[in-house]
């Protein structure tokens, strides 16, 4: 379960916040609200039910708080009571965040009002409490009781962050020129107050530089496995060691936000213009536009050609066995489950250098020992041994009872004097695609080889990202790189939520920082790259083109595994479709209807028999071209369906019948059959076809 977080923003809405200072084009309030809106967008995108927000403004024209009976709390308004961040409500509140007509209102009193809101909402429950103050610190501030207030904040674990417009900050060498004496004194006292409650005090300029930085969601560590780590024969206690360990995710792919289908009508377009105070009504209205998906299962009767609906519970799993569907019930699938025991079991060890780099195909997980002395001692000794011997461990891992075993490589990892193992899943034999690629031609000229080696060596040295000439700031490190797609989409969602008709701004500098190599380094490599390009000119060979898959078979040219698989399984995807089943081979379109009949379950025998009759009829009707096309299709599918003997017998009978008629054109047809490669299927052609399947 994620931590419950309560955040209260304290905003300075004084009259002075409406002016621009030091050449800025935005007023002080607009400037500080840019951070406020950026923080809210993070909360909307996170969409956590345990994350609540409150907004308190001071130096307001009116007073709206529970402590307003005392004069010290006048001109302070609770603009948004602590609750879940609702976009429509916060959008209406944001429209009221404008400079007031007064300078009355105390900052310390506003902090007290915010603390009172937190205390009543969070009570004594475990919350992560944050109070963010955005102010220019102009005017008079009452610091008479700040020590007692700081003690209360510390006692209730409230984090206080004060980010001030044009605050002086020594550690970044920033100071505002011609600062007013009152503002300067306020900054000093505010810094003392913040430091006394262990908060954060900094100038808003530093905060503003981080606005738009991709937000990385923090995830609480949750163990995905707890069990035994066995070294040796686990069945024998005398010859094995069992360590209690826990497994945690280390790296996981962050996916972009997913979209949902909604129906946009006139009411949903005008909805955001309404000011609805009841959140239940709001949620119900938004959910009414969501599109729900209903799935139905239809079965077609091949005899009557009618369809009828069946329930999901009445369906069974089926697997294709050639063109036959083999059903396996759920009870049978349970019987097929492996009788395995959860845990890690060490199989052996390999040198680090023997692991192919492309074998790491999975996410990474980290293994830590349980919090007892014996487990930590044994585990630490095992990790240190791997590190000293420069080896990895191979382990068999099962995550649950009767689970599927996987093969892992365990890598030693030491961080902050703590010992861990990082596990990465290895592929099985069927998971590897052992493609072989043609070699590049070697240069016969030794002088050319020497020049290329020298140029490549210079290029590598000049493109060193750790050098002082590198233009990346900050340096190129994994923690400074961000995935473009999810963060760019989040930026678009946040922008269009506030400005539906606006133009999406350019991607943030944090996303585009490492999209191109540093120009300063590339300029040093121009001559080397030019030499490499001249010496290593690669001519791409022209790929042969085939008009059809039959041509590829007839010419002996290889076709891809995907093309063969498509031919073999071309009918499976349409068995449950809306297309009507074709039950007979027609003389108008013999090739097309023959292919469709083959898609039917148990349609092979009918398709071959009818195609043989159609070819004979076409010859009798002197439609020789169509007969040759049909014979070519029959020959190809006879190879694919292992009906070679039947085709050869049929072709022998067909030739004999044609020659008995003794017609000149039919005799010419026999010659065309031979010249077109449609004669009897020989053994070497079958061997060539088998080689295609093994590609």
Swiss-Prot record:
Cell compartment(s), UniProt: Nucleus; Chromosome, Telomere
Entry's transmembrane regions: none
Keyword DNA-binding appears in the UniProt entry: yes
GO molecular function: 3'-5' DNA helicase activity; ATP binding; ATP hydrolysis activity; damaged DNA binding; telomeric DNA binding
InterPro entries associated with the record: Ku70/Ku80_beta-barrel_dom, Ku80, Ku_C_sf, Ku_PK_bind, SPOC-like_C_dom_sf, vWFA_dom_sf
Residue span, Ku domain: 229-461
Pfam families per record: Ku (PF02735), Ku_PK_bind (PF08785)
Disulfide bonds: none
SUPFAM superfamilies, A to Z: C-terminal domain of Ku80 (SSF101420), SPOC domain-like (SSF100939), vWA-like (SSF53300)
Keyword DNA damage: yes
Signal peptide range in chain numbering: none
EC number: 3.6.4.12
Keywords assigned by UniProt, alphabetized: ATP-binding, Chromosome, DNA damage, DNA recombination, DNA repair, DNA-binding, Helicase, Hydrolase, Nucleotide-binding, Nucleus, Telomere
Ranges in coiled-coil conformation: none
Lineage: superkingdom: Eukaryota
Substrates-to-products reaction catalysed: ATP + H2O = ADP + phosphate + H(+)
Membership in a protein family: Belongs to the ku80 family.
Subunit structure: Heterodimer of pku70 and pku80.
Function comment: Single-stranded DNA-dependent ATP-dependent helicase. Involved in non-homologous end joining (NHEJ) DNA double strand break repair. DNA-binding is sequence-independent but has a high affinity to nicks in double-stranded DNA and to the ends of duplex DNA. Binds to naturally occurring chromosomal ends, and therefore provides chromosomal end protection. Required also for telomere recombination to repair telomeric ends in the absence of telomerase. ku70, of the ku70/ku80 heterodimer, binds to the stem loop of tlc1, the RNA component of telomerase. Involved in telomere maintenance.
PANTHER family hit by this protein: KU AUTOANTIGEN DNA HELICASE, X-RAY REPAIR CROSS-COMPLEMENTING PROTEIN 5
Identification of the protein by name: ATP-dependent DNA helicase II subunit 2
Organism: Schizosaccharomyces pombe (strain 972 / ATCC 24843)
Taxon lineage: Eukaryota, Fungi, Dikarya, Ascomycota, Taphrinomycotina
Gene that encodes the chain: pku80
């Amino acid at each position: 379960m994620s931590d419950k977080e309560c955040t209260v923003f304290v905003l300075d809405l004084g009259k002075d916040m409406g002016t621009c200072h030091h050449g800025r084009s935005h007023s002080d309030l607009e400037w500080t609200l840019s951070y406020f809106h950026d923080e809210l967008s993070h909360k909307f995108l996170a969409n956590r039910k345990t994350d609540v927000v409150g907004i308190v403004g001071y130096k307001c024209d009116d007073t709206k708080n529970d402590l307003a009976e005392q004069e010290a709390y006048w001109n302070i308004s609770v603009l948004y009571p602590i609750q879940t961040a609702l976009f429509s409500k916060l959008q209406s509140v944001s429209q009221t965040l404008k400079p007031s007509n007064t300078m009355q209102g105390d900052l310390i009193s506003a902090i007290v009002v915010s603390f009172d809101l937190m205390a009543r909402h969070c009570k004594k429950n475990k919350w992560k409490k944050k109070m963010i103050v955005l102010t220019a610190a102009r005017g008079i501030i009452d610091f008479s009781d700040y020590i007692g207030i700081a003690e209360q904040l510390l006692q209730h674990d409230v984090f206080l962050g004060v980010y001030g417009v044009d605050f002086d900050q020594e550690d970044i060498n920033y100071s505002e020129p011609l600062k007013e004496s009152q503002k300067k004194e306020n900054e000093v006292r505010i810094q003392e107050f913040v430091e006394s409650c262990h908060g954060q005090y900094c100038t808003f300029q530093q905060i503003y530089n981080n606005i738009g930085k991709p937000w990385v969601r923090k995830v609480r560590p949750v163990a995905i496995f707890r069990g035994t780590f066995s070294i040796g024969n686990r069945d024998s206690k005398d010859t094995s060691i069992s360590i209690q360990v826990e497994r945690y995710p280390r790296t996981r792919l962050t996916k972009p936000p997913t979209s949902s289908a909604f129906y946009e009508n006139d009411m949903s377009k005008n909805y955001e213009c309404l000011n609805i105070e009841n959140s239940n009504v709001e949620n119900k209205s938004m959910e009414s536009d969501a599109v729900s998906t209903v799935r139905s299962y239809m079965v077609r009767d091949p005899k009557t050609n009618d369809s009828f609906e069946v329930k999901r519970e009445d369906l069974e799993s089926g697997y294709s066995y050639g063109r036959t569907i083999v059903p396996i019930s759920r009870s049978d699938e349970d019987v097929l489950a492996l009788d395995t025991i959860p845990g890690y079991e060490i199989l052996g060890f390999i040198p680090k250098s023997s692991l192919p780099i492309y074998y790491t195909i999975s996410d990474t997980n980290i293994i830590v020992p349980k919090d007892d002395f014996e487990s930590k001692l044994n585990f630490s000794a095992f990790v240190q041994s791997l590190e000293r011997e420069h080896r990895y461990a191979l382990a068999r891992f099962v995550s649950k009872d009767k689970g599927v075993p996987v093969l892992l490589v365990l890598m030693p990892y030491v961080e902050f004097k703590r010992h861990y193992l990082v596990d990465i899943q290895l592929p099985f034999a069927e998971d590897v695609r052992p493609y072989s690629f043609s070699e590049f031609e070697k240069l016969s000229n030794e002088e050319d080889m020497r020049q290329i080696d020298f140029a490549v060596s210079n290029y590598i040295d000049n493109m060193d990202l750790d050098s002082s000439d590198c233009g990346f700031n900050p340096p190129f490190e994994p923690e400074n790189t961000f995935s473009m797609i999810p963060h760019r989409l989040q930026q678009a969602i946040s922008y269009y939520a506030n400005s539906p008709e606006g133009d999406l701004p350019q991607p943030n500098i944090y996303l585009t920082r490492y999209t191109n190599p540093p120009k300063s380094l590339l300029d040093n490599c121009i001559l080397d790259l030019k030499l490499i390009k001249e010496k290593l000119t690669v001519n791409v060979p022209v790929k042969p083109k085939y008009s059809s898959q039959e041509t590829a078979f007839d010419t002996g040219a290889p076709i891809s595994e995907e093309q063969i698989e498509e031919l073999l399984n071309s009918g499976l995807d349409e068995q449950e479709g809306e297309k009507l089943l074709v039950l007979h081979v027609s003389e108008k379109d013999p090739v097309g209807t023959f292919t469709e009949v083959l898609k039917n379950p148990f349609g092979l025998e009918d398709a071959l028999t009818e195609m043989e009759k159609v070819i004979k009829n076409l010859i009798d009707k002197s439609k020789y071209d169509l007969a040759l096309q049909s014979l070519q299709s029959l020959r190809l599918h006879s190879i694919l369906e292992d009906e070679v003997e039947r085709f050869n017998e049929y072709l022998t009978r067909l030739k004999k019948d044609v020659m008995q008629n003794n017609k000149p054109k039919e005799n010419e047809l026999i010659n065309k059959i031979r010249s077109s490669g449609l004669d009897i299927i020989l053994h070497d052609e079958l061997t060539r076809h088998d080689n295609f399947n093994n590609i």
